[in-house]
Amino acid sequence: MSPHLEKVDEKTLRLFYSSIKVKGIAVSLCDYQLNCEIQGSLQRMSDLTIIETKDGVRRGYFVELNPQTNQKDIFTAIFSEDGLSYSEKTPLGFPVDRDEIAWGVPDAVLIPNGLVRVYWTYTEDKTSDEKLISATSKTTKGIDFVMDPGYRLENGYVDFEVIKAEEGDWKALMSYTPHYMPEIPQSLFYATSKDGLDWDLIEERITPKGYTYFDPTGIPIDEKNYLIVGSAAPNVMGDREHLLFTAMLVLP
């Protein structure tokens, strides 16, 4: 489902999510109770996040198959205000084979110094647990990136979503690998950081154990409350129905 939630105004939200109904990414306008109406769709891409750069450019980051290399890569492009069109698409240059499953779900965030950082899930081989890595843009344009050294988190955490990135005060949500289902269901977790590179993870899940929860996205309502949208599914292997859920994250 890979939802991405953004604020339009005090009454309206825009929600992007992968949808079988539109055979791509559905673009919906919603109220704050998440009553939504689809406005259109985006094709041949997945895992979209959109930020506004320091220069005031509305820039999206997403996964797409590169037909020239037959590999998946993270791309960036300039997006229209309504989120229904884009231009000037450019690959970031971190490709993987198209059948690499445990890779992707990039999350882009504008960091306090005006640069852009993109986080995504990575595996060193087909069997090891996932790791979270990142790259930071060379300039405020958010087009050319260099890998950040090391890992943000290891041991199977995935679907990283930064919900706050301020000087000395970072907050993020993430999910856990599906590899150990149903014994260990996918759940959401919370972490904090001072610089967005070294993270302190609270290892206690923040979602109920009996279901699986993943792909979180969110916006602040105020200093302590965040409106969260994510994907959820029964804690079983094989084909299963995926839905979007909404929740309020209340910080201590």
Q: How would you name each of these model-derived features?
A:
Residues 1-47, 51-102, 109-158, 163-211, ...:
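Beta-rich carbohydrate-recognition and catalytic domains
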